[in-house]
């Protein structure tokens, strides 16, 4: 087996990785939103926030360019320089050694880039989770993915929720924009990104520090690069004119029946006014006109984030699939563990 660096500009290699992605999703995630070739190409190149990253794929020996699996390794360059985030995708049970060898290779690449900890996810109760624990990973927290089926939502449901929330939000007004962040809001969006540091995460993870330049260079550039239709709804504090809350959602034009929830944040001084529910309900009202073909919206929440879960459930989100486990794996532990010499890593996606 050959493990080769993925060139995201090489259409044939990206297509080979996409075929792996599709096969894995059909086996493990048949209810979830489909990924598109264009989205995967952009993701392999720069991930979600344009952090440095690299991707590698496993091919058969010889000249056969059928991929059996691939991984994506994110290497943050502003905070958490000791960490790397890893995603591995392999075909359903082609050969247990594929996932094992990709994991070992990813550990070697992480170490070569000065990283000492891998952060990764696995389905709770899956063979992958069991394998990662046997390789030395420790559980950090769990999260579940939820979906909102707009086809079954009662008429007027989101409007009623928005109006009910607005009664607790005197002194705030709603604004919207599509596409990249307007220049005048860059600083406020950065402040709300910093408010996301309150969300559950691994112990020892450093706060992300956002400013206007980072919003433009990392978030907005990702919107443009991936070619998604991006929507933002914000609550403005009337007395100061500052943004107090923000929710964002994206629609892939190649898969327009699904919406993908981005960040939802309420700045600390403005919490307690139901602004989270207000902006999210307003978003869904807006999309009924802006994206009439939209059928479902997906989101994910850490189990500990009870407040956001309660908002999503009020909107109508329901569990889409079992909980996922976030794990932390020291690179040295991974590479020194003899369990990697055994054919025990089941195929699938994480």
Regions found by a protein language model. Give the residues of each.
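Short amphipathic alpha-helix that is part of the acyltransferase structural core
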Residues: 1-46, 164-214, 338-339, 344-350
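Conserved donor-binding loop and adjoining core beta-sheet/short helix segment
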Residues: 6-8, 21-124, 236-238, 244-267, ...
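Conserved beta-strand-loop-alpha-helix junction that forms the acyl-donor binding cleft
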Residues: 91-92, 119-128, 267-271, 296-309, ...
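Acyl-donor-binding surface of acyltransferase catalytic domains
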Residues: 92-184, 323-328
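Conserved acetyl-CoA-binding loop-helix of GNAT-fold acetyltransferases
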Residues: 95-108, 134, 266, 272-286, ...
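Active-site/acyl-donor-binding loops of N-acyltransferases
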Residues: 135-154, 231, 285-337, 341-350
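Short gly/pro-enriched beta-turn/loop segments at secondary-structure junctions
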Residues: 167-170, 184, 226-230, 244
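Amphipathic alpha-helical hairpins
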Residues: 199-202, 212-233, 243, 250, ...
């Amino acid at each position: 087996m050959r493990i080769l660096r993925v060139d995201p500009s090489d259409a044939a290699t990206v297509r080979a990785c996409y075929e792996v992605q599709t096969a894995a999703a059909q086996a493990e995630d048949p209810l979830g939103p489909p990924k598109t070739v264009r989205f995967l190409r952009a993701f392999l190149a720069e991930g979600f926030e344009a952090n440095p990253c690299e991707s590698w794929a496993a091919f058969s020996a010889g000249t056969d360019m059928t991929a059996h699996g691939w991984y994506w390794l994110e290497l943050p360059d502003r905070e958490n320089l000791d960490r790397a985030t890893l995603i591995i995708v392999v075909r359903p049970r082609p050969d247990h050694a594929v996932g094992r060898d990709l994991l070992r290779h990813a550990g070697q690449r992480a170490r070569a880039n000065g990283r000492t900890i891998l952060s990764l996810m696995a389905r709770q109760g899956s063979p992958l989770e069991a394998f990662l624990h046997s390789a030395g990973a420790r559980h950090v927290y769990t999260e579940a993915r939820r979906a909102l089926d707009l086809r079954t939502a009662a008429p007027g449901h989101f409007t009623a929720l928005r109006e009910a929330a607005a009664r607790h939000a005197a002194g705030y007004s709603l604004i919207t924009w599509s596409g990249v962040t307007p220049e005048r809001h860059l600083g406020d969006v950065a402040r709300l990104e910093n408010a996301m540091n309150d969300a559950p995460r691994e112990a020892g993870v450093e706060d992300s520090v956002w400013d206007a330049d980072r919003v433009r260079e990392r978030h907005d550039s990702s919107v443009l690069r991936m070619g998604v239709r991006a929507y933002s709804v914000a609550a403005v504090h009337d007395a100061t004119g500052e943004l107090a809350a923000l929710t964002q959602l994206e629609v892939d034009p190649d898969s327009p029946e699904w919406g993908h929830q981005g960040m939802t944040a309420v700045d600390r001084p403005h919490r307690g006014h139901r602004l989270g529910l207000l902006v999210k309900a307003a978003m869904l009202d807006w999309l009924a006109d802006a994206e009439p073909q939209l059928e479902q919206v997906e989101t994910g929440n850490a189990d500990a984030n009870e407040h956001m879960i309660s908002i999503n459930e009020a909107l109508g989100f329901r569990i889409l699939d079992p909980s996922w486990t976030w794990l932390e794996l020291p690179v040295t532990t991974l590479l020194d563990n003899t369990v990697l010499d055994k054919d025990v890593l089941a195929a699938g996606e994480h």
